[in-house]
């Protein structure tokens, strides 16, 4: 059997970015044949990716790309916050955002089929994703994306966990300020008329329950409910919210935009992991189960 040297392991690691021990194992199995070891790693890492695919991805990053009046916003998920800070993972998200903007894929599957390189050759985005899963040992997925075109665009990223793209006409500085405001205050619609009916009904139900508990007469309780709903609508409607940078603490976003002669036509807000049920590990229960299983086997 051929001797496996440190330089051979280093060379294979440089080619594959696989963990050091995995490289050594592959070289040993391939009897020192670098090309064969590389192929073995590719198969092994692919298998590793397959095993990871079923695990929940509730962490990750939001990335954006804007070029003129074309842009994109994308959320790419990972299992842990640690991986979401990995440079290769962040690069994957940024590349995906650019591909969405430039190629307008119909869905995640179509996005994955696009070449990772802008030169249109080499591995696809999906192949790069699977390769990263194999190297890192953690599942990752393209959760959602949106493409924008035909309008002036402004974006704001709060770290890598919150991303906003605003479609507007007028002053770019004002639009960027609004994007930052949206990231901070998280409105659900431009105006109260745009708030989804199901959200209003949910708020009305909660308000009605509170009013019933108050023991007030029916007419007063009804006014309490309506007051709560109207307050909620102002709190979640962008134009009615108090602008986060308002000098007087009173100016609304709508008033600020009017003063800046700027119109916001729409916005998209992504928050990493929003709506995803995260897995909670109960280590005490897990240990207890293992002890019980060991006793049963004894």
Curated annotation (Swiss-Prot):
List the Gene3D superfamilies.
Answer: 1.10.286.20, DNA helicase RuvA subunit, C-terminal domain, Elongation factor Ts, dimerisation domain
Residue ranges for the region (Involved in Mg(2+) ion dislocation from EF-Tu) are: 80-83
Q: Which InterPro entries match?
A: EF-Ts_dimer_sf (IPR036402), Transl_elong_EFTs/EF1B (IPR001816), Transl_elong_EFTs/EF1B_dimer (IPR014039), Transl_elong_Ts_CS (IPR018101), UBA-like_sf (IPR009060)
Instruction: Report whether ATP-binding shows up as a keyword of the record.
Output: no
Q: Name one GO molecular function term.
A: translation elongation factor activity
* SUPFAM superfamilies according to UniProt: Elongation factor Ts (EF-Ts), dimerisation domain, UBA-like
Q: What is its main location?
A: cytoplasm
GO annotation, cellular component aspect: cytoplasm
The keyword Cytoplasm is annotated on this UniProt entry: yes
Record localization: Cytoplasm
Q: Which UniProt keywords apply?
A: Cytoplasm, Elongation factor, Protein biosynthesis
The record ties this protein, via PANTHER family, to: ELONGATION FACTOR TS, ELONGATION FACTOR TS, MITOCHONDRIAL
Family according to the record: Belongs to the EF-Ts family.
Its job: Associates with the EF-Tu.GDP complex and induces the exchange of GDP to GTP. It remains bound to the aminoacyl-tRNA.EF-Tu.GTP complex up to the GTP hydrolysis stage on the ribosome.
Task: Kindly give the HAMAP family that the UniProt entry links to this protein.
Answer: EF_Ts
Q: What is this protein called?
A: Elongation factor Ts
Query: Which organism does this record belong to?
Result: Paracidovorax citrulli (strain AAC00-1)
